[in-house]
Structures are given as structure tokens and as C-alpha cells.
């Protein structure tokens, strides 16, 4: 448990930059995506835990997943309403966030005595291999956001925002092709805050 605390304290003290600056539109894009991603990952962990006979862990993750979905729905609704009153600026903010990729707060993840960010890639590989959160989940989230905000039906856009929309409409398909080519390394990673179930 101490190593979990150390990792958490490092994460807090190292801070993170989610790429939104002080732009409220970008912040809402970030939270809409991030909350859906955490819903997906907690829901997947719940399934894995249930399959492994860890009912309490599964139940806890389901509860957290439910909270994440409620947050996602709220932020998604904020953006839907912003699109109604400021479609071009909202489209450009969405475009900027997706073009430069949504980064998770844990990108600087590290263990005790580790370098900043030294753990995130390993953690991501394990999560992808275990089916907790995959590149296909990322693609699915893009598709869901495009559908939730009716990106293809928004009117009154500037020419710049129209170009942004065209990019956003093609992005999920492009990312899906990339996801199909990704090979997750079959390496074993040991984390200080996890004991093998052996």
C-alpha cells in the first residue's frame, strides 16, 4: 500500500499538462473524453475481476464506472449546448484537442526512485494487453463523441471550422487503421505496488 501512496504523491507533485491551457471549450472536450475513457477502463477491470472471482473489486469498479459515465454525460451535454451557440469556435477547440491527442493525467506516472514518466508506457502496455484500455477503445470514444455532438450535422461553420470538421470526421477511421497495426510488446512488467497473484 505504501508504494501506491508514493506513486500517487509523485503524480500530484509532478503535476500534468492536459493541453487545454485556460480554454474552457478545450477543457470540456478533455473531460468528455477522459471521463468516458475512465468509464471504459473501470468497466473492463470490473469484468476482468468478476471473471477472476474477485467480486468486491468488480463491484467497486462498477460503482466507479457509473460515476465516470455520469460525469461524461454532463460534460458531453455542456459541449452539445456550446455547439448550438458557438459552433465554429467549439469545432476548432475539438479539432485542436484531437489533433494533438488527449493525454491522460497519469502520463508522468512513476514509482519510488523512478524518473518522471518512466512508468506510463509500461503501465499502458499492460493495460492494453490485459484489455483494460486499448487503442480500439480510444477509436470508439472518438466515434461516440462525434455522434453525441452530431458533428456531421452542425451548420453555420466558418471555412476554417469546416476544415476542422472534415478532419474530425475522418480521424476515427484513420486511427482505427493505426490501431490495427499496433503490436503490443509481450513483455512482463513488475510494478512495486502490485504483488503477482501467484
Positions of PLM-derived features:
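Non-heme di-metal
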Residues: 1-198
Amino acid at each position: 500500500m505504501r508504494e501506491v501512496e508514493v506513486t500517487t504523491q509523485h503524480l500530484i507533485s509532478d503535476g500534468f499538462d492536459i493541453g487545454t491551457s485556460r480554454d474552457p471549450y478545450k477543457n470540456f472536450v478533455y473531460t468528455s473524453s477522459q471521463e468516458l475513457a475512465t468509464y471504459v477502463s473501470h468497466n473492463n477491470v470490473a469484468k476482468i475481476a468478476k471473471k477472476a472471482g474477485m467480486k468486491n473489486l468488480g463491484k467497486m469498479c462498477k460503482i466507479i464506472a457509473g460515476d465516470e459515465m455520469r460525469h461524461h454525460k454532463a460534460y458531453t451535454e455542456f459541449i452539445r449546448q456550446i455547439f448550438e451557440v458557438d459552433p465554429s469556435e467549439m469545432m476548432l477547440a475539438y479539432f485542436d484537442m484531437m489533433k494533438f491527442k488527449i493525454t491522460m493525467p497519469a502520463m508522468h506516472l512513476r514509482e519510488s526512485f523512478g524518473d518522471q514518466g518512466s512508468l506510463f508506457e509500461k503501465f499502458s502496455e499492460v493495460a492494453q494487453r490485459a484489455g483494460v484500455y486499448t487503442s480500439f477503445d480510444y477509436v470508439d470514444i472518438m466515434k461516440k463523441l462525434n455522434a453525441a455532438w452530431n458533428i456531421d450535422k452542425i451548420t453555420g461553420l466558418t471555412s476554417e471550422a469546416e476544415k476542422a470538421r472534415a478532419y474530425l470526421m475522418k480521424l476515427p477511421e484513420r486511427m482505427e487503421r493505426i490501431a490495427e497495426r499496433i503490436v503490443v510488446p509481450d513483455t512482463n512488467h513488475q510494478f512495486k505496488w502490485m504483488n503477482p497473484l501467484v
